[in-house]
Amino acid sequence: MVAFCAHSATLGLPTVLENVFRAQFASELPSFARHRTAIISRRPAYSRQFRSLSHNGFSLSQSISSSSSQSPATSQSQSKGNAHQSEVSIEDLTDNVTTSNSTSTPKDTPHTPPKASKTQKNSTGATEKNSRADNGLKATGPKPKRKKEGWQIQKDALKQKFREGWNPPKKLSPDALEGIRHLNAVAPDRFTTPVLAEQFRVSPEAIRRILKSKWRASEEELEDRRKRWERRHDRIWGHLSELGLRPKTKRTEPFADTNVLYDDRRKGSR
């Protein structure tokens, strides 16, 4: 029968782990003691919690010391239970410390000004709208009248003078004047003033003045007038022929605008 050796039992893996855990916990005990004294000086209410912690630590140290003489299986189970109890007690202690700090000494929160009520917001919005409306009225107010230019003054004067529009009097030829007098003398009932005005496209007042006029030109004046009207006719015909509206003729060729222009230049060069 094999005898049990106590020295060989201490060299097992569970025993080595117990010794390591005991050395680590022994090194952390001074820090726990300092933490306890600091908390007691600031918060006396935590003394009971630290007492329980010290009691648990003391019981844990006793259990570790007694576990060296026990069997490896029982010592390992007890060390695990004690370690779990110590961890639970430390977590409870830290939770209590944080809750007590949050309740007893509240943090300095920044002072926030009170929010404006809805009525104040509405009043401020109404004042802003009114100010904007006033600024808009000032900006879109009556602008100073600008001084009219010369062409604008002339245009207004023509509108007042010719309310029905610009309708210059038509210049009638001597033959047309003689024809008006002849028609009115032959059949005055048929060729009345409105009919003659519509036929010759002039105003009725112009027809009345032509019929009332008693002035008659002499033969020399009639001949001179006839020549002037022929030249006028040829000049207009030559202008229309250059535009392609009338055929060109030898009679109207000297009165064309091109010939008149180049003849003047030739005469000037000479």
Swiss-Prot record:
<feature type="region of interest" description="Disordered">
    <location>
        <begin position="248"/>
        <end position="270"/>
    </location>
</feature>
<dbReference type="InterPro" id="IPR010487">
    <property type="entry name" value="NGRN/Rrg9"/>
</dbReference>
<keyword id="KW-0496">Mitochondrion</keyword>
<feature type="compositionally biased region" description="Polar residues">
    <location>
        <begin position="117"/>
        <end position="128"/>
    </location>
</feature>
<dbReference type="Pfam" id="PF06413">
    <property type="entry name" value="Neugrin"/>
</dbReference>
<feature type="compositionally biased region" description="Low complexity">
    <location>
        <begin position="59"/>
        <end position="79"/>
    </location>
</feature>
<keyword id="KW-0809">Transit peptide</keyword>
<comment type="similarity">
    <text>Belongs to the RRG9 family.</text>
</comment>
<comment type="function">
    <text>Required for respiratory activity and maintenance and expression of the mitochondrial genome.</text>
</comment>
<feature type="region of interest" description="Disordered">
    <location>
        <begin position="59"/>
        <end position="152"/>
    </location>
</feature>
<protein>
    <recommendedName>
        <fullName>Required for respiratory growth protein 9, mitochondrial</fullName>
    </recommendedName>
</protein>
<dbReference type="GO" id="GO:0005739">
    <property type="term" value="C:mitochondrion"/>
</dbReference>
<dbReference type="GO" id="GO:0005634">
    <property type="term" value="C:nucleus"/>
</dbReference>
